[in-house]
Swiss-Prot record:
GO terms for molecular function: rRNA binding; structural constituent of ribosome. One of its GO terms (cellular component) is ribosome. The gene is rplW. InterPro entries: Nucleotide-bd_a/b_plait_sf, Ribosomal_uL23-like, Ribosomal_uL23/eL15/eS24_sf. Part of the 50S ribosomal subunit. Contacts protein L29, and trigger factor when it is bound to the ribosome. It comes from the Bacteria. Gene3D superfamilies: 3.30.70.330. SUPFAM superfamilies: Ribosomal proteins S24e, L23 and L15e. It comes from Ureaplasma parvum serovar 3 (strain ATCC 700970). One of the early assembly proteins it binds 23S rRNA. One of the proteins that surrounds the polypeptide exit tunnel on the outside of the ribosome. Forms the main docking site for trigger factor binding to the ribosome. HAMAP family: Ribosomal_uL23_B. This is Large ribosomal subunit protein uL23. Coiled coil: none annotated.
Amino acid sequence: MELTRVILHPYTTEKTYSIRNKSEHETLTFIVDKNANKYQIREAFIAIFGLKPLKIRTTNRRPAKIRTSTARPGYTKAKKIAYVVMPVGVKVAVSKEEVEAANAK
């Protein structure tokens, strides 16, 4: 699998925002390819950001039922989420606003 196709995009929710700011280790969350393992995610992260993560945790989200106007329920997409834990003191700019703020300094 190509390293550029492992990490699809950042995953930002209220929960991930609170996880990121809760501890001394910065935790980043990404949606990754469903077939990617932790070693591939680590290599892709190093290739993209140039930083070595401390730890990587993954979880698979099942499709959830959603209401539709018909009698048959719809489903959300299944996804694999990677939680990338960085060493103490290492900051990574993931969002567009963070990159612009880092460039302004």
